[in-house]
């Protein structure tokens, strides 16, 4: 949500962040952090986790340190105030509003402000100057702002008690395993574990965590990076080390389809790989994070796809947007409207560009059609619902990657749907065919 850390659309490019798959993280940061954490007295484990996570957060951009501190303080103090004024609804609403404005305000300023200014200038012919100094995003801001939002809302709903220890709360917000790619962890998911100081973890948990981390790393390095090279070879980018890239304008329609399929595989292995590494590291530290992916490419409908893809994000929007708006309890028209709001916000969450908004609305249309009449027919089929779903998902990823480096949105869709000549895929099938086959097997 957002090729560096993740495929470029999920996390806006950072200034050399400390990525899970880098040598310095694998052989320096992670071993040192785990050693300090395991050796620390029980009462100091959260302090060690908090401080090490701050180092991780500040590694690439220390100038964003005040942003994290401010976000922690705003939500920590607001949570205490909401609980303190339990018998005064107006004050409770006021402090909830403070927390929401603080979290959403920071997210909007860093991620969307310049996009809004550019869009207004383009639509109205104005000449508002863009804000300087926010060309890169604070690391993981799309993820940890949603965590602070859920915390403040849950305290307001009385679903959880406000955290009184600021170190514990800070450790929850900035916990490095889930900071850059999720899963999005609600406070109630880890609140009990944050307050278990002795016997938080055991050797079996550490072993399970190491296994999950290794599988996630393999997904990222052996599959995502390798199959992503096919997409890069096809589109070509200015700083690509490859000397064999074709360029989108020179690619034939079959080659572009091969490339977008490769991108779809890369996106899944990259994102799910990072999430799995995060879940694994959480287990090593004694925390059980929720699963984030469940073989989404085996889905037989778009509805099922969104139950399997980025499950913590879908669950977040369902709990904090869809259900409060009325969910499916207020009639079909209201349900479709609620779906529209959720999918629009999902697109906006993934990035500050119009292609993300189009991508979100694209899925709204598909989900609405399934709600209205398609689902009963899809449930009757065996093979064709899977083909239908995969085709539409791949087309969606083409929309998602539109306007990325080396990709022109209009040209990409022209190549996909208006048959054209150019470089054919035979050379790339010879070089990547086995890898593609293995990748398909590993995601089904």
Residue map of PLM features:
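Membrane-embedded transmembrane alpha-helical bundles that form the catalytic cores
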Residues: 2-443
